[in-house]
Amino acid sequence: MSKAIVKIDEFIKLSKSEEVLPSAFTRMKSVRVSTVDKIMAKENDNISEVDLLKGVKLVKNGYVCLVGLVVSGEWNLPDNCRGGVSICLIDKRMQRHNEATLGSYTTKASKKNFSFKLIPNYSITSQDAERRPWEVMVNIRGVAMSEGWCPLSLEFVSVCIVHKNNVRKGLREKVTAVSEDDAIELTEEVVDEFIEAVPMARRLQNLRKPKYNKEKENKNLNNKNSIGVSKPVGLERNKVRSVVRKGVRSDSSLGVTDMSQDGSSSEISSDSFI
C-alpha cells in the first residue's frame, strides 16, 4: 500500500533497465519504502517521535539513507475553519537548532487535506536508526477546539536505501539544494494571511530551553544544599587551638572529634559550577 502512495522515481532517477527489470536484478534491490506511521496532533507546539523507517529491515552494522518522505495531513474539522499549522521535521541528534530542522511546511485549516514531500537525502548508521532519531514538531495556531480533541492527523511514508558498506551505490538520487543558513521551507500556495512569524529553528530552541533550564536549576539547588551542610575545616581547627591556649587539656573528654587532614568534608567538586 505504501508503494502505491509513494512513487520512487520522484526521489530517485531510474534508468531504462531499472524501470523495466525486476528490482532483484538491478541496483533497486537496496531501495525500501516504509509502512505508514501516524501522528494525532492534539497539542500546540508539540514534539512527537515519528518512525520514518517503520517496516524497513535494516542491515546489521550497515547504513540507511533517508532519501525522501511524503507527509499527508487531514484536518478533522468542519469546513471553513480558521487557523492553520506549521509542521517541521527534526533530527533530534543535532544540538544546533538550525541544523536540527530538516524542513518545514505551513498550510491553512480551510484546506481539508494536504500532502508534501521532503528530501533529507543523508545516511545514518543502522544502530542509530534503531533509536528513531527523527521527530516532528507541530504548531497549530488559531484553531478553536477544546482540549483533548484531535484537530489534525498526519501520516508519514519514506523512501530509503539500505546498504552494508558506506560506498556510493551508483543510484542517482534527486537532491534538493539547501543553503548553508536555512533549512528547506515549503509553503502551500493557498496560504496568504496565515504567515509563520517565528522561524522553526527559533521555535525549536524555545521548546528545548525550559527543559535544560529546569535541569540546571535543580542541579544548582542540590549543590547549594550540600555546601550548607558541610563545615569549614579551618573553623573547627581554630576552636581546638583556642581551647588549648586556655590551658584546657585536649583529650577525649572534650568531645572534640579528630578531623582528617585532607579536608575532604568541605571539598566542592568542579562539577558544581557546570
Swiss-Prot record:
InterPro entries: TMV_movement (IPR001022), Viral_movement (IPR028919). One of its GO terms (cellular component) is host cell plasmodesma. GO terms for molecular function: RNA binding. Transmembrane segments: none annotated. The keyword Transport applies. Its main location: host cell. Keywords: Host cell junction, Host cytoplasm, Host cytoskeleton, RNA-binding, Transport, Viral movement protein. It is found in: Host cytoplasm, Host cytoskeleton; Host cell junction, Host plasmodesma. The gene is MP. Belongs to the tobamovirus movement protein family. Residues 209-274 are annotated as: Disordered. The keyword Ribosomal protein does not apply. GO terms for biological process: transport of virus in host, cell to cell. Transports viral genome to neighboring plant cells directly through plasmosdesmata, without any budding. The movement protein allows efficient cell to cell propagation, by bypassing the host cell wall barrier. Forms a ribonucleoprotein complex with viral RNA. Binds microtubules and modulates microtubule stability. Can bind double-stranded DNA. This is Movement protein. It comes from Tobamovirus Ob. It holds the Pfam family MP. Residues 250-274 have a biased composition (Low complexity).
